[in-house]
C-alpha cells in the first residue's frame, strides 16, 4: 500500500492490511508463518522551519502482528517468534535537511526516517518494524550446545566422537607458562 502525500493533504489515511507469507521480503533467514496483520493511521504533520518554509512530515502510528520462524544461531533448528508490535514513526522528506555543513541531532530527531518522492510504501515500514522486533541472536533454548565445529552434527541430538580440542601451536608458549604457574 502506497501512502500518498496528496491524500494526506486532504485527510488522514487509515489502513488495515493483511500481508500473506512472502509478500514482504524479510530476508533469507526469516520465514513468515502466518499472515501479517497491520492496522493504523497515517497523518501529515506540518513543521514550520522559518518564516516561509513548511516541511511535510508523514506520521505513521499503528500495530502489527504475525508469526515468524528464524533459525537458532547455534544449532540452526527453527525457532518460532510471535511478533506483536506497536509503532509511532515520523518520516521527513529526504534532502530537506541539506544545505547545512554539520547538523546536530537531538534524541528525538534520531528517530526520524526519510521518504522520497510523493509518499512511502507501508510494506517498507512494516518490514523494518518486524525485523526490529526480533532479537539480535535467536537461540532455541538457553542450554543449546550448537553444532560440532568438526563434523557439523547437532550436539543437542547426538554426542559426536570428534576431538574436542585441537591444539594451535601458536599458543604453546602460553600453555607452558600456565603449566609452570600451576605447579
Predicted regions and their residues:
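Structured interface patches
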Residues: 1-183
Amino acid at each position: 500500500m502506497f501512502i500518498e502525500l496528496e491524500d494526506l493533504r486532504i485527510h488522514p489515511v487509515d489502513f488495515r492490511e493483511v500481508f500473506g507469507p512472502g509478500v514482504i521480503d524479510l530476508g533469507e533467514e526469516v520465514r513468515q508463518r502466518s499472515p501479517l496483520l497491520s492496522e493504523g493511521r497515517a497523518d501529515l504533520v506540518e513543521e514550520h522551519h522559518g518564516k516561509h518554509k513548511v516541511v511535510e512530515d508523514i506520521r505513521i502510528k499503528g500495530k502489527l502482528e504475525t508469526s515468524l520462524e528464524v533459525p537458532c544461531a547455534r544449532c540452526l533448528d527453527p525457532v518460532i517468534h510471535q511478533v506483536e508490535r506497536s509503532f509511532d514513526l515520523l518520516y521527513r522528506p529526504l534532502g530537506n535537511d541539506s544545505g547545512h555543513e554539520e547538523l546536530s541531532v537531538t534524541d528525538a530527531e534520531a528517530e526520524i526516517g526519510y521518504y522520497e518522492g510523493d509518499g512511502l510504501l507501508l510494506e517498507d515500514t512494516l518490514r523494518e518494524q518486524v525485523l526490529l522486533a526480533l532479537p539480535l541472536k535467536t537461540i532455541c533454548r538457553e542450554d543449546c550446545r550448537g553444532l560440532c565445529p568438526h563434523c557439523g552434527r547437532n550436539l543437542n541430538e547426538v554426542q559426536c566422537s570428534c576431538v574436542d580440542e585441537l591444539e594451535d601451536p601458536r599458543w604453546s608458549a602460553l600453555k607452558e607458562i600456565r603449566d609452570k604457574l600451576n605447579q
